[in-house]
Amino acid sequence: MAKEHSVYELNRIQQYIMQMRPVLKKEALFSDGTKDYRNPTEPEAGEKVTIRFRTGKNNVDIVWLCTDCEHYKMKKTESDREFDYYAVEMTMGEEPFYYYFEVASGLLHVFFDRYGVSKERRDAYRFCIIPGFSTPEWSKGAVMYQILVDRFYNGDPANDVLTDEYYYIKTPSKKMEDWNQCPSDFSVGEFYGGDLEGVRQKLGYLQNLGVEVIYFNPLFVSPSNHKYDIQDYDHIDPHYGKIVVDEGELLQSGTTDNSKATRYVNRVTNRENLEASNAFFAELVREIHARGMKVILDGVFNHCGSFNKWLDREKIYHANGGYEDGAFLSKESPYRSFFGFRDENGWPDNTSYEGWWDYDTLPKLNYEDSEELYDYILGIAAKWVSAPYYVDGWRLDVCLLYTSPSPRDRQKS
């Protein structure tokens, strides 16, 4: 006669059997945003999207696609020698659609997101579909060449940054006389003289390499060689473009006051220099396009630089005249709302502005409280993809870390 088991014993037996399943093959779990796992990849609002997920063959019990509010059980639709494939169909709304996956194998539950397998849900790494957002066909699979201009090629020595031209991050600017000399450990103020004329002279070389897209690191006015601390979004840095009026003095040894760096002030604020540099860039883009290549710019819109004309911590624009007071100098500045200040009684020379990762050379842009800033940046995005520049697109720096123009607004601009 067969032995009868209590409910408790049956539960223990069931748990034992579940635990005896093959070990979960975490390395087999996979999904991404390509057409193999999301079809269509760039849906419109109201369109149905098939989302797929891969597992090891006969290795899991259940796969769910998860949103903030719901778990949707996925159906096994296909298998091959090594893998099973699960799918579910979702209808897109108007808003971004965020999702991740949960996988059950016996008593083991794991999650899968853009960063892979995890024991816990990670909202920051969810997959995202933005209905109505698409990327141009020319960008898909294109051969892209990234250029940090200062380190590419010096085509015009007349625009080189000079030694002692100005002072930045506890060091004076330095012109590197030997192109082959290795940069120092802290080289933000060391300049090798690469410029846009150098890029123009090497376009044939780039074309022969098979380059289809040139992606420029930031080109706008900035005191550093990397230029992720932008001083003026409206103009190409004359040190990369054209210096047609070159007047003023270098800093005296030991001087740190950039309002006295009159050579630098003239170079980066003189209207003739700025307009000539913008015009040269427009010509360069036309020549790049004539060779069948595209151009992408680097959009650094999360933060700017302490030299920026909206803040003007260095009093470069205040000393030059013809510019509004920066928000560092005056609470009445028209740019006051562009930055978040912790001390409302800190003016003049209010150092309490919020910096990205607390770096005072990288003031955080305050989109949350400034509709004017929001509109200004959208205008900048539109300016450089319009006549006479006709840039083909933007790469957005640290775009996940700031509240800024929405993806849909950026696309429209």
Regions found by a protein language model. Name each.
Residues 142, 149-212, 218-388:
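Substrate-binding/active-site clefts of carbohydrate-active enzymes
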Residues 370, 399-401:
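Short beta->alpha junction loops/turns
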Residues 60-62, 97, 110, 154-156, ...:
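Intrinsically disordered, low-complexity acidic/polar segments
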Residues 385-392, 400:
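Alpha/beta-hydrolase fold catalytic core
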Residues 2-140, 145-146:
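Glycan-association/targeting regions that enable binding to alpha-glucans and other polysaccharides
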